[in-house]
Design a protein with these regions (language model features):
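Conserved hydrophobic helix-helix packing surfaces used for dimerization/oligomerization
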Residues: 5-7, 28, 269
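C-terminal helical "tail/cap" subdomain of flavin- and related membrane-associated enzymes
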Residues: 299-425
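Glycine-rich FAD pyrophosphate-binding loop
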Residues: 22-41
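Beta1/beta-strand and adjacent pyrophosphate-binding region of the FAD-binding site
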Residues: 1-11
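N-terminal Rossmann-fold NAD(P) dinucleotide-binding loop
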Residues: 14-15
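Predominantly flavin-linked oxidoreductase catalytic cores and closely associated redox partners
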Residues: 110-242
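FAD/FMN-dependent oxidoreductases across multiple families
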Residues: 125, 217-300, 306-309
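A conserved beta-strand/loop capping segment in the N-terminal third of enzymes
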Residues: 47-106
Length: 425
């Protein structure tokens, strides 16, 4: 492949794209002044994400820990409430956790081993014209024939060549690293205000604990940290910690309408991972989709029309699933549904299996509702149908839930298409 590629950002998307392209003979330059670094997320890497990078990243390459179970706490409002936790056991290798700094460093090492070069400088501007790309750092300009923006939610490449994310398209993850303690269990505490959940994710030598809220939901980072501290105290998730280190980070959180009109690429450039908005709106997990988008551009640059080919591939491997998650998001965190879910986890082994697969990345949103309904006992199924109808009436008056013999059917007059927009639009 005779191609000069400039990649802004050395996270999973950028490093994996660099590895794949350099391996094919492209001349690849990665620009990032500070990678590898920790990322304020859970740190979990699903089995399907590990499978994507298995050829370049052997299992022995990372200091990692395997999650054995997930504990789900009862619904809380702005204050903690009492209730019974439900525990879901996970298969071995269903979910592993690693330091994001170590994971990113391993991918970057693989890219450099394949022939990519790293320029440890901050990119201050990019220019695209009909003949070439210019990437500007404080020390001068670098030129290429194709530009990849893999520089996160605050992507400079996105701001210059597409549209910056609006506030309502972002969420804020805020919390603490709890040093000096770890475990082999995820802990999730559902909350109704803001709608979502608190989490405690173990890493090899500490816990990542936090909460996520839409950026336009009216909560400051300080308020979210206070709620996290209250939960840490109430749930006892960080007993024995030696130090709490605060963090805060923006994460894309798009609606179904946003995904239908997503900015992915244009002539001689594309966006990957968080920079493209390829993050699950429910779990805020983006590593798998970042890696798959990197694979998409590596394959598309061999095509006659790389932009169209890339856009098609991303819609096939990511957008359809993410748009479904976006359509489910508000209903998923409704108090009535959360209470039903916790009851089902307590009473149904089938539902616990579904949740384990969802955590591990094996369960798609496309079949989630029907698999849940099929696994429920008769009494829970009746409650589920009633709950879904109530949520539909209260939150989605334009949608109808109807029953036909043997199944439930959801219809909608405002369902967004899963087909890609015009390339370069």
């Amino acid at each position: 492949m005779k191609l000069d590629v400039a990649i802004v950002g050395a996270g999973p998307a950028g490093a994996w794209a660099a590895y794949l392209l350099a391996r094919e003979g492209a001349r690849v330059t990665i620009f990032d002044p500070s990678h590898p670094r920790e990322k304020p997320c859970g740190g979990g890497v699903t089995g399907r994400a590990l499978a994507v990078v298995a050829d370049a990243l052997p299992a022995t390459a990372l200091d990692r820990a395997t999650i054995r179970s997930a504990r789900f706490g009862p619904l809380r409002g702005s204050a903690a409430s009492a209730g019974q936790d439900e525990v879901v056991r996970l298969d071995a290798e269903a979910l592993i956790v690693a330091s994001r700094a170590a994971f990113d460093a391993a991918l970057l090492d693989a890219a450099r081993g394949a022939g990519a070069s790293l320029v440890a400088e901050r990119v201050v501007d990019v220019h695209v014209d009909a003949s070439r790309i210019a990437v500007q750092t404080a020390r001068g300009a670098h030129h290429a024939s194709f530009l990849i923006g893999a520089d996160g939610a605050n992507s400079l490449v996105r701001r210059r060549l597409a549209r910056a994310f609006r506030r309502d398209q972002l969420s804020i993850a805020t919390g603490f690293y709890a040093h000096g303690v770890t475990t082999d269990e995820i802990v999730v505490g559902f909350v109704s205000d803001p709608p979502g959940y608190l989490w405690s994710f173990p890493r090899p030598d500490h816990l990542a604990i936090g909460i996520c809220a839409q950026a336009d939901a009216g909560f400051t980072s300080g308020e979210l940290r206070d709620r996290t501290l209250a939960w840490i105290s109430h749930a006892g998730v960080a007993r024995g910690h030696t130090r709490l280190e605060p963090y805060s980070w923006p994460i894309p959180s798009l609606s179904a309408a946003d995904f239908a009109a997503i900015d992915l690429a244009g002539p001689r450039w594309c966006l990957l991972g968080d920079a493209a908005g390829l993050v699950d709106p429910i779990t805020r997990e983006g590593i798998y989709f970042a890696l798959r988008s990197a694979e998409s551009i590596a394959a598309a640059l061999r095509a006659a029309d790389p932009v169209r080919d890339f856009t098609t591939r991303v819609f096939e491997t990511a957008i359809g699933e993410l748009a479904r998650a976006a359509r489910l998001k508000d209903r998923f965190f409704q108090p009535a549904f959360v209470r039903l879910l916790l009851r089902a986890l307590r009473q149904s082994a089938g539902v616990r299996a579904v949740m384990a697969d969802l955590i591990a990345g094996r369960q798609t949103y496309r079949s989630l509702k029907w698999r849940l309904l099929k696994t429920l006992e008769v009494g829970l199924a009746i409650d589920a149908a009633a709950t879904l109808r109530r949520v539909q009436r209260e939150k989605y008056p334009s949608r109808a839930l109807t029953r036909t013999p043997g199944r439930l059917t959801v219809t909608s007059i405002d369902r967004q298409p899963d087909s890609p927009p015009r390339a370069g639009a």
